[in-house]
């Protein structure tokens, strides 16, 4: 595990993966980057061999989370000012959509209540909670997406809603409760309420996704070696669904289609 600020993308993309190395470089040159850290590809390769975290890795993750708390002024799992993070894969070679991501880690029944107090926006909070419940259950607990998708579609149809934006705070709260019930039925246990356990299980899931069939098939097609491994990027959450004045997206500094035609290397000049 290596914090972004200590590294440069010129020398460490094999260790930090493409995302981690670029975040490190952006931090180095002073671009505002949400606080976080990267678990190296070496840790992934070790986990693939032994099915266990490398010795000392988890202690380093705990220390890095403490530093992230210090930088943000928030506390992971805190009932007053909770820190929420994402857990994303990031290999040296881009493999779009082939590996796993979990967002909004750190939410539970306690931190949801504190987030509502902090934001005064219960609709937003229950929306991001249902996203965690669905995504974590699918990626980490390996519960089929259909259980969550079908329930939401049926509920929206019963209410006469055409799009998700018509859902109210009470609607999303109901969906959260139903999603937690699905977890009990399909997984046999309650959804993990401990944020530290959430991030540990999400990290394992990202490591496992490197050797998943979808990722292996993609690497075979693109001639990417299995030995690269994937890094894991733990980053403070930035929300694109907070309200009408928030959004997320991708920005290119040049036309990606025309650039691709003159050489792949030049595609790397992008935001």
For the regions a language model picked out, list residue spans one by one.
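N-terminal beta-alpha lobe that positions the nucleotide/phosphoryl donor
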Residues: 9-233, 242
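ATP-dependent carboxylate/acyl-activation modules
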Residues: 132, 201, 242-248, 252-270
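Single conserved hydrophobic/aromatic residue that forms the stacking wall/gate
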Residues: 1-12, 265, 269-271
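A broadly conserved detector of short glycine/acidic/proline-rich loop/turn motifs that flank catalytic sites
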Residues: 89-91, 99, 236-238, 256-257, ...
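Glycine-rich, charged/polar anion/phosphate-binding loops
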Residues: 218-220, 233-237, 246-252
């Amino acid at each position: 595990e290596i914090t972004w600020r200590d590294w440069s993308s010129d020398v460490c993309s094999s260790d930090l993966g493409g995302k981690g190395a670029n975040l490190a470089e952006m931090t180095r040159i002073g671009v505002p980057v949400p606080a976080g850290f990267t678990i190296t590809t070496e840790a992934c390769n070790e986990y693939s061999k032994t099915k266990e975290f490398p010795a000392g890795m988890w202690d380093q993750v705990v220390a890095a989370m403490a530093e992230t708390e210090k930088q943000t002024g928030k506390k992971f799992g805190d009932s007053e000012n909770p820190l929420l993070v994402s857990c994303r894969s990031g290999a040296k070679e881009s493999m779009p959509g082939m590996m796993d991501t979990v967002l909004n880690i750190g939410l539970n029944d306690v931190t949801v209540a504190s987030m509502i107090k902090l934001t005064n926006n219960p609709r937003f909070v229950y929306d991001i909670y249902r996203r965690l419940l669905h995504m974590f259950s699918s990626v980490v607990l390996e519960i089929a997406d259909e259980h969550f998708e079908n329930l939401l579609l049926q509920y929206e149809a019963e209410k006469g809603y055409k799009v998700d934006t018509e859902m109210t705070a009470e609607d999303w709260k109901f969906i959260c409760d139903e999603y937690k019930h699905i977890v009990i039925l399909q997984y046999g246990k309650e959804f993990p309420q401990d944020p530290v356990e959430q991030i540990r299980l999400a990290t394992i899931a990202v490591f496992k996704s490197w050797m998943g069939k979808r990722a292996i098939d993609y690497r075979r097609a693109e001639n990417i070696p299995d030995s690269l491994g994937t890094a894991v990027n733990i980053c403070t959450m930035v929300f694109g669904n907070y309200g009408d004045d928030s959004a997320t997206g991708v920005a290119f500094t040049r036309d990606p289609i025309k650039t691709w035609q003159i050489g792949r290397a030049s595609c790397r000049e992008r935001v």
